[in-house]
Amino acid sequence: MDLIQALAAELGKDPRHVENVVHLLDEGNTIPLIARYRKELHGAMDDTSLRTLEERLQYLRGLEERREAVKKSIDEQGKLTDELTAAIDSAKTLAEVEDLYRPYKQKRRTRATMAKEKGLEPLAALLFAQERDCPRPEEAARDFVDPEKGVETVEDALQGASDIIAEQISDDAAIRKSLRALISRQGQLVSRAATEDDSVYRLYYDFTQSVARLQGHQVLAINRGEKEGILKVSITLDREQALPLLRRAVVKPGSAAMEFVKSAAEDAYDRLIFPSLEREVRNQLTEQADEGAIGQFALNLKPLLMQPPVKGKVTMGLDPGYRMGCKVAVVDGTGKVLDTAVVYPTYGERQKNEAIAALATLIKKHGVEHIAIGNGTASRETEQMAVELIRQVNEGSAHVSYMIVSEAGASVYSASKLAAEEFPQYDVNLRSAVSIARRLQDPLAELVKIDPKAIGVGQYQHDMPQKQLDEALNGVVEDCVNAVGVDINTASPSLLQRVAGLNGTTAKNVVSYREENGAFTSRAQIKKVPKLGPKAFQQCAGFLRVPESRSVLDNTAVHPESYEAAKALLALSGHTLADVKEGKLSDLPARIKAYGEDKAAGEIGVGVPTLRDIVSELLKPGRDVRDELPKPILRTDVLEMKDLKSGMVLTGTVRNVIDFGVFVDIGVHQDGLVHISQVSNKFIKHPSEVVSVGDVVKVVVLEVDEKKKRISLSMKQAK
């Protein structure tokens, strides 16, 4: 089976579509461009499917390279047979390839290699063959006693032969494959306490679970507990289940050497095979857990980045604190800083009243409509002050509301070189307040400035393979930025470098060009940016918006390569570009449907998927896909944990989705947990089948433990 067929079978896709995607990737096209503008070639796969295809393509190509390297190495030893070549070529995983290569690898000095140096290999071969006329092992060994070679006795010779046979059995790919499968089916992971002290790992102090049923979050928690020296972990398998399998593979009944080989096989299992497979199984469990956790992190990150913006509103950002006070920043509707201050609401009643008065003055002065409060230290006290403040100012003509905003990564950003370049005039603390205000206005534009790992919507992210995690999360950020589109005249370098086809250098060049020449007035002008060549332009043009352009198409997701098709479509339906600008296209979908999509697509020279995308963009030039999502919850009053009672029905926002449940912000400074058993009335394997981060959900309070700060919620009982 060739690479394309293998990928198509694995992913359940049409081989022609897979081949087209592979070709597009090999040409250097980006995933966002392929997903958005090459739908006809791949059957409209989404960006997640395309990234999975790309990842598997890299793995299978790596597998093929390893196959060739292994065959070359064995061939150079003069040991490559047709049968071995076929086995290597048909190996489906790297583990299978390595099993086949194992007997031919250069080995470190082992008991078996030392026995071979003593000339005991012929004895091992004679006994392992177990021919009918094979002499008894003790008789056969007498001829190999040689004190000069270090073989003093018959027992020494037999021990050396046994070591050679044991290693040979251990290197047998078929045996390893069978035992690996047995451990996967019937093995158990056992975790015991290494200390009597209480810890967060107490759940795993006396824990046993079958390998097949282990959950990813359990594996990651156990690994961390073991790393910290709190847990002792092992894989167990009933030895009496494994040994018969081994004996059937290597022992020939009736031979005089049968018992000797049986004993060598048991030594191979105990000393070589099982310890090796135990490490392998632990590694495989960790890899699977990492893969699942990274996938879940990416799944959680996407809706967080795609939170609907609260656009065009003057916003006050509050970065709460005790000793250093509460940092304040007021930004206008575009995120430009209008004012900053520091107040001390936690110092006492007098200081709190002074803080309220100072903030009320800022609200009145700048026409603040929303307050964004960071959810870190002193957030509860700051929220209570904000509610008093809102009550006061809303007695007049103001209509101010607030929202608690995650400040994850804000402190990292505020102390970064990027923040220093953006706000050289403000200290670190005030930069955090600006970031918090902007997170409410446009979460995506602000969060792209932060390492995705610092946003905090994953499990055990610091224990995962960082390269793999970075690739997955950066892919999500890139997909989100390109799905939304970027205003080239206002975007920061951080946002621009996430656009398909651009990088750190070209993003800075775009900003420099903008500063030197004024705002871009057309997409075509983007070609003048230094180091932004034709290929980069092809990749990025459709994702960059130019609201100031005379051509309305420059403020849509229609790619310049489809401009002529868009104009032809308008002419076909009796419309003009002026109608697009003036929003006079409400009848366009009906006209195209009446004309026939296939016929229209053929006449304007595009496929039906591209035709539909063009129609969608012409109807809403400058649209933001995030505006179609549920709006964030803005509050004017505060709820506290002591106010919660069992049976209360509340509305909250999903903050995190993990293997065992969903954390929901219900506005009390302590996220409640909806256990997986309370997420849905139907059976689900994972909460992500039902909810995503950022979803607004109804929940029922089941139980509140103020002392432990735990809130148990149910979604299924709220339905």
Region spans (language model):
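A glycine-rich phosphate-binding loop feature that marks nucleotide/adenosyl-phosphate handling sites
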Residues: 181-188, 318-322, 376-378, 404-412, ...
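Short, ordered loop/turn segments at secondary-structure junctions
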Residues: 37-39, 128, 238, 320, ...
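Long, highly charged, low-complexity intrinsically disordered interaction regions
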Residues: 55, 61-79, 89, 412, ...
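Duplex nucleic acid-engaging cores and interfaces of nucleic-acid transaction enzymes
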Residues: 33, 49-52, 59, 63-317, ...
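Structured, non-catalytic alpha/beta "coupling" segments that mediate domain-domain communication
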Residues: 73, 87, 98-101, 225-238, ...
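Single-stranded RNA-binding regions, centering on S1/OB-family and related RNA-binding modules
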Residues: 546-550, 554-719
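Generic start-of-chain signal for non-secretory N-termini
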Residues: 1-19, 26
